[in-house]
Amino acid sequence: MSKALLVLEDGRVFTGMPFGAIGQTLGEAVFSTGMSGYQETLTDPSYHRQIVVATAPQIGNTGWNDQDGESRDDRIWVAGYAVRDPSPCASNWRATGTLEDELVRQRIVGIAGIDTRAVVRHLRRYGSMKAGVFSGKAMIEPLNIEALVQHVRTQQSMLGADLVGEASTLDAYVVEPKGKERFTVAALDLGIKTNTPRNFARRGIRSYVLPASATFNQIADIKPHGLFLSNGPGDPATADHVVALTREVLNAGIPLFGICFGNQILGRALGLSTYKMVFGHRGINIPVIDHATGRVAVTAQNHGFALEGEAGQSFDTPFGSAVVSHTCANDGVVEGVKLADGRAFSVQYHPEAAAGPHDAEYLFDSFVELMAAQR
């Protein structure tokens, strides 16, 4: 039986068997604790240039379908996939094929049969790090582990990686509302998931999805009732254009809502700095405290960077007073910020879920209420 290797930059090597395409891939090794929703994970643009390790032991049981993808064309965005026990068949009435067939079709190199618990414990202790998956001719014969480790180390770090332009749409497009149109939103695509415009559409909102390179004049031409900042990959410290654009929007008084990467962008626009987390938050059961109400929501998350700040912290900005509105109950990481006057707010987690709980879906309604009040 042929074998595959997961090689980490610190020299740790895990041996398994090929899963998906044969060859090599490089990326940042991260882990996701979700017990379900692997198709949504694989197609989430926020995972661009990352090798995802699944903590759930069995992956692929429900195969692959043409409904659950979170990218517009069902593109798989992960750089590689590492699993313990993949299902060789698809057991679901919606399935159009197996997970491995789709990985092969999209040329995603993966590895199976490894001790994913050991990998996760290693990443928790030492942090997310550069990695590579190698199989077939890419393993270099005779096998030279040190050469593979050196190859892994040559890739760019996620720290300082400007990836938004690679994940954003090149051309603007429109997602029409369901039923009567109530509002128009300019949605800045920093790596947007398809379920977000769907949530807007269900609330009667027409979404103009714009590339990350959009200018304020292009936004103003739409005459939107609000601006949405999406999720996305890479280091938010590199997104200076989007931060400057956000400040223009705030100066214009346009209501603003951001999620995930968009939370980091709003935070930077308000004067906060960002940092790279040790291993990040990636899962669908992460508790978040809303400090205005004391309520806890179980949330879906996918981020390796976060805003500096503390629970309930108030701070002055050029746009008025702001506050750290949400933090993670597990580790105190900032999970939301907002302007005190309420015209701009953002959260680090994913209220649109896909996959995950719907505890925070009310935030879309909060955005609708904000736009209605500013109309």
UniProtKB/Swiss-Prot annotation:
Pfam entry (one): GATase
EC number: 6.3.5.5
Pathway stated in the Swiss-Prot or TrEMBL entry: Amino-acid biosynthesis; L-arginine biosynthesis; carbamoyl phosphate from bicarbonate: step 1/1; Pyrimidine metabolism; UMP biosynthesis via de novo pathway; (S)-dihydroorotate from bicarbonate: step 1/3
SUPFAM superfamilies recorded: Carbamoyl phosphate synthetase, small subunit N-terminal domain, Class I glutamine amidotransferase-like
Binding partners and assembly: Composed of two chains; the small (or glutamine) chain promotes the hydrolysis of glutamine to ammonia, which is used by the large (or ammonia) chain to synthesize carbamoyl phosphate. Tetramer of heterodimers (alpha,beta)4.
Family affiliation: Belongs to the CarA family.
Its job: Small subunit of the glutamine-dependent carbamoyl phosphate synthetase (CPSase). CPSase catalyzes the formation of carbamoyl phosphate from the ammonia moiety of glutamine, carbonate, and phosphate donated by ATP, constituting the first step of 2 biosynthetic pathways, one leading to arginine and/or urea and the other to pyrimidine nucleotides. The small subunit (glutamine amidotransferase) binds and cleaves glutamine to supply the large subunit with the substrate ammonia.
Protein name: Carbamoyl phosphate synthase small chain
Organism: Mycobacterium leprae (strain TN)
The gene coding this protein: carA
